[in-house]
Amino acid sequence: MIQQESRLKVADNTGAREILCIRVLGGSTRRFAGIGDVIVATVKEATPGGNVKSGEIVKAVIVRTKKETRRADGSYISFDENAAVIIKNDNEPRGTRIFGPVARELREKKFMKIVSLAPEVI
């Protein structure tokens, strides 16, 4: 459950370490975002020499949330942290590596490149 002002870890090698959500995309009254939803964020912490700089505005897709997500079979999935992957405007990841597990819901939302780069899909 991500909303405005939520801080997320970045699970790719773009150079960003932490981002802050400034908008949840998908309608003017949309408040919360879950796994597979796209947000607009600003980079709060970045490593030197990375592709993105601190203060840059980016689009990102959420890959892990602490809040549990219900699946069609009745099971729930949750993670230890909130994490996102920075994407381009065509929903392709900006980085070349993904760190940590990602949820299976990304495959249903057509983020195939992120799913294929991830070391583990849960």
Curated annotation (Swiss-Prot):
Function: Binds to 23S rRNA. Forms part of two intersubunit bridges in the 70S ribosome.
GO cellular component: cytosolic large ribosomal subunit
Subunit-structure text: Part of the 50S ribosomal subunit. Forms a cluster with proteins L3 and L19. In the 70S ribosome, L14 and L19 interact and together make contacts with the 16S rRNA in bridges B5 and B8.
Superkingdom in the source lineage: Bacteria
PROSITE patterns: RIBOSOMAL_L14
Regions that span the bilayer: none
Name assigned to this protein: Large ribosomal subunit protein uL14
Nuclease in keyword set: no
Family membership: Belongs to the universal ribosomal protein uL14 family.
A molecular function GO annotation: structural constituent of ribosome
Entry's Gene Ontology BP terms: translation
Entries under PANTHER family matching the protein: 50S/60S RIBOSOMAL PROTEIN L14/L23, LARGE RIBOSOMAL SUBUNIT PROTEIN UL14M
Keywords: Ribonucleoprotein, Ribosomal protein, RNA-binding, rRNA-binding
Any single Pfam family the record assigns to this protein: Ribosomal_L14
